[in-house]
Amino acid sequence: MAALRYKADFLKASIDGGVLKFGSFELKSKRISPYFFNAGDFYRADLLQAISTAYAKCIIEAHKSGQLDFDIVFGPAYKGIPLATAATDKLAQLDPETYGKICYSFDRKEAKDHGEGGNIVGAPLKGKRILIVDDVITAGTAKREAIAKIEKEGGIVAGIVVALDRMEKLPAADGDDSKPGPSAMVSSARSTAIPIFAILTLDDIIEGMRGLASPEDVKKTEEYRAKYKATD
């Protein structure tokens, strides 16, 4: 696999652990996908180690390349919460000198009106550079909501890291999927002017799944990419 080692390790763990499944899955877009990735299935300790390592190494790679600088790792409720906390812990393990004092925060779905109150749990966001960690970008709606919450608290969104870029074009308004179009990830990056990084792309999956999945699953995934791949 031409991808970096951590990407290959993450892909293998995802397939072996049943987090990345092959078959027939109806998406929110009503498309029938031959694969499905569910970051919520990283609930076993060894799988959590795999995903936290992948997030941390992707973040370090972006940071060292000068594309990303941040103070706080933020996990949007609900799936983003364990991802952000695990990634923060792994960053400190891998490079304590650089990331030992990095903080994390997450939001509540509903504001708390007693105790410490508010919408945010963890480090205060005001005046800080915030890195959002989440599973995927579909339509970008959830990310825009997270950005709005962070900005309301006075934080500055520095970047977004997701586990998977499906690289597929957004559904056409008129339902004609033969038309070219941008991906959700690129569309979100353009509309927000915030850099977005992905651990894996669909290209990575197809390149790396050979030998880990059946030839029929590889063929169906390649056909899906050919039909729905974004033109950005």
From Swiss-Prot:
5-phospho-alpha-D-ribose 1-diphosphate binds at residues 28, 78-79, 108-109, 112, 114, 134-142. One of its GO terms (biological process) is 'de novo' pyrimidine nucleobase biosynthetic process. PROSITE patterns: PUR_PYR_PR_TRANSFER. SUPFAM superfamilies: PRTase-like. InterPro entries: OPRT, Or_phspho_trans_dom, PRibTrfase_dom, PRTase-like. One of its GO terms (molecular function) is orotate phosphoribosyltransferase activity. Pfam families: Pribosyltran (PF00156). GO terms for cellular component: cytoplasm. Homodimer. HAMAP family: PyrE. Belongs to the purine/pyrimidine phosphoribosyltransferase family. PyrE subfamily. This is Orotate phosphoribosyltransferase.
